[in-house]
């Protein structure tokens, strides 16, 4: 991978789960900041499947990135949802998926900010996205912007929360991984499945969105390649 660092000696903390989105963000951060200027924070919040943490640990080690595991499992004692129990995945009467964990991204950003300030780091990167909106209110840009202001005021520190995937579709996120030279890496090593199935169950909302985006991107890529071949033949 060709490493450059347009950010000078600045460093970044990536909120990292081992999934497609956060791994793509981590790879982009390594490119943009340099591998020695990137750290990952991973949260143990009581998620129902250990495979998420295992994947995150393996990827961080493989990429040579320092990873810090933060235990926020206390949240499991004060809220319930399908991400932290064996409940069947469904939506409520308002269309909110029961995979939504109340306060999770707010909590993650708070702890990531506390950690970042302790390391003298201002840039925090998270892979939230509102384009393929899952119904999660804490994935919206308005929330991230407000949280950035709140954290700056709360700690008297100039955090810069970056959301490189905010306005990308899932297909565009796959495209970004490909541009980073890591399409196969993300396909093979990341975990997205809500049911904790190695390689994905293929039926949960997360797997369906991931596969739909991948198929869309590969179809677009194939069309571009065919067009390029035809153009070359005509030249």
Swiss-Prot record:
Keywords: ATP-binding, Ligase, Metal-binding, Nucleotide-binding, Queuosine biosynthesis, Zinc. Its cofactor is Zn(2+). Zn(2+) binds at residues 193, 201, 204, 207. Its EC number is 6.3.4.20. It catalyses: 7-carboxy-7-deazaguanine + NH4(+) + ATP = 7-cyano-7-deazaguanine + ADP + phosphate + H2O + H(+). GO terms for biological process: queuosine biosynthetic process. Pathway: Purine metabolism; 7-cyano-7-deazaguanine biosynthesis. One of its GO terms (molecular function) is zinc ion binding. Catalyzes the ATP-dependent conversion of 7-carboxy-7-deazaguanine (CDG) to 7-cyano-7-deazaguanine (preQ(0)). HAMAP family: QueC. This is 7-cyano-7-deazaguanine synthase. The gene is queC.
